[in-house]
Amino acid sequence: MEENTKKKYVIDASFVLSHLMPDESSEEATRFFLKYKTKKIEFITTTLLLYELVNSFSSNIKRNRISPSEANRLLDLYQDYRIVEYSVNLKEVLKLSLKYNISCYDSSYIWLSKEKKAKFLTFDSQLKSITL
């Protein structure tokens, strides 16, 4: 019963990276992750998130912002959170992408947020304006 009463949040890559990346640290993200870790809230995301994180780590390695071993450590840290991932309705994602003139990647998070009636946590200002 307790699981169903937890406030649910959809998280995207910008939100996760602001928590994981040493030079992008955000107090807001850290507070939310602490609440998640102590089981006060629930995080959910799309199956796409992990690919976005790995792509960001790869880009950051190429720019010498992090080392490959640091990327592996951050990936392990994220996976240790065991955040539930959902597949999305691709036709609805396409519709939202066209409606808001955003990528299908971004619209997948918006779709999940609407579908699961969960607040969307992002640091992408364009996406914040759509979901408010």
Question: What residues fall within each predicted segment?
Answer:
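Short loop/helix-cap segments at secondary-structure boundaries that form the rim of catalytic
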Residues: 129-132
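Short, well-structured N-terminal submotif of metal-dependent ribonuclease cores
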Residues: 1-48, 60-69
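Alpha-helix capping/helix-boundary segments
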Residues: 15-16, 49, 109, 126-127
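Active-site-proximal, substrate-binding regions of enzyme catalytic domains
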Residues: 54-81, 90
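Short, mixed-charge aromatic SLiMs
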Residues: 38-42, 75-84
